[in-house]
């Protein structure tokens, strides 16, 4: 009789745990998760075929909407709202499933970033990092850190972007993801350059190129070429630009390469060649900054050759584009400064929350151990 009572005492919590979701439709999500890394389109198709989602348990519903959001994000489906991923964040916030909790907050950040809500995106990304040390999904951590770094660079707060971008490089290195490292190193190099560390920027781009293999990313070659031109390494810069041009897929992507190539020819006193590429930028580049760069270099050439009327005309065109760019940047800067102070408040609050959560977890663990000791002691006392 006593043995039966002991058995029931052990069995009751097991039955209670296993009853979660009882009476609800259950789904095996493993096939979807296996498809997600390489075939997110197939994963999305499977998820969309699931019917009666309202009959899912709360746990399965959270898992479903997390996977659905991930598949949509990876297949570039336009996000309209964060209401579905909120079902996942609300559920996982109450659990100890750290990786899914972090992933849910990350995708909530991604959606809000796409919806042009950078303040909310930053908040959710930082929430995803609250228990960073205990998460081993380096692909997820790399994306979170890289996105936070990117948001800081948009604000031109480069010193705050730097540590997150360094973490992103390390996360992708731990994962042995070469292309992840390439993109993270490129972004890190840009930040180093904006902070005035040209040597560090060169090293980042050199490392990125060494990791590429056959998967050429033209922008890295172009940016390294620009850095080499500053150091008068013109022959090396020319080789990099040729590689960049040979690997461009979209026609409009050639203009940033043309701008650097025009600057190289100008430095090398090959004025006709310089004018050809710079004029193409001034007339046809889709981005105002690239057009402005072409006009500025052409203006400098005209002044050097004492072509005063041409120089005046180019100067007028350049200043017109520059003024419109500066007005846009000033408006953006005001928004960014306001956001930056808000980000600081959020970051401080979330780091305090992380510390509090860590302390609470410690006390919770102690209380669980204490309860187990008391339970075992009670069982042995009862048996005796």
What do these predicted ranges mean?
Residues 22, 57-61, 99, 139, ...:
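Residue signature of alpha-solenoid helical repeat architecture, marking inter-repeat boundaries
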Residues 19-70, 74, 79-82, 94, ...:
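N-terminal leader/linker segments that initiate helical-solenoid repeat arrays
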Residues 47, 52-54, 92-93, 112-113, ...:
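Eukaryotic all-alpha helical interaction scaffolds
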Residues 35-48, 75-87, 118-126, 158-166, ...:
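Helix-turn-helix repeat elements of alpha-solenoid scaffolds
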């Amino acid at each position: 009789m006593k043995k039966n009572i002991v058995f029931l005492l052990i069995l009751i919590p097991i039955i209670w745990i296993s009853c979660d979701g009882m009476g609800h439709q259950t789904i095996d999500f493993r096939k979807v998760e296996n498809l997600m890394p390489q075939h997110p389109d197939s994963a999305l198709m499977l998820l969309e075929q699931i019917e009666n989602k309202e009959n899912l348990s709360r746990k399965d519903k959270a898992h479903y909407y997390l996977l659905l959001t991930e598949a949509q994000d990876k297949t570039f489906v336009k996000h309209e709202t964060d209401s579905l991923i909120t079902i996942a964040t609300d559920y996982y916030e109450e659990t100890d499933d750290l990786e899914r909790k972090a992933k849910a907050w990350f995708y909530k950040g991604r959606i809000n970033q796409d919806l042009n809500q950078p303040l909310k995106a930053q908040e959710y990304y930082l929430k995803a990092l609250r228990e960073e040390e205990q998460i081993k999904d380096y692909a997820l951590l790399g994306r979170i850190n890289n996105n936070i770094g990117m948001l800081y660079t948009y604000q031109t707060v480069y010193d705050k972007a730097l540590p997150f971008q360094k973490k992103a490089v390390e996360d992708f290195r731990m994962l042995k993801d070469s292309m992840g490292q390439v993109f993270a190193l490129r972004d890190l190099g840009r930040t180093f350059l904006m902070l005035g560390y040209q040597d560090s920027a060169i090293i980042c781009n050199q490392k990125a190129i060494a990791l590429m293999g056959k998967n050429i990313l033209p922008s890295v070659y172009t940016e390294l070429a620009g850095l080499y031109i500053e150091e008068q390494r013109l022959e090396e810069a020319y080789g990099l630009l040729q590689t960049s041009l040979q690997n461009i897929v979209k026609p409009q992507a050639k203009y940033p390469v043309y701008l650097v190539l025009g600057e190289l020819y100008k430095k090398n006193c090959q004025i006709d060649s310089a004018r050809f590429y710079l004029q193409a930028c001034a007339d046809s580049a889709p981005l105002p900054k690239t057009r402005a760069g072409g006009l500025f270099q052409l203006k400098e050439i005209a002044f050097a050759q004492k072509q005063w009327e041409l120089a005046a005309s180019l100067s007028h065109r350049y200043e017109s584009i520059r003024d419109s760019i500066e007005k846009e940047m000033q408006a953006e800067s005001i928004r960014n400064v306001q956001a930056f102070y808000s980000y600081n408040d959020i970051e401080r609050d979330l780091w305090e929350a992380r510390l509090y959560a860590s302390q609470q977890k410690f006390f919770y663990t102690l209380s669980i151990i204490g309860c187990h000791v008391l339970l075992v002691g009670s069982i042995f006392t009862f048996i005796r």
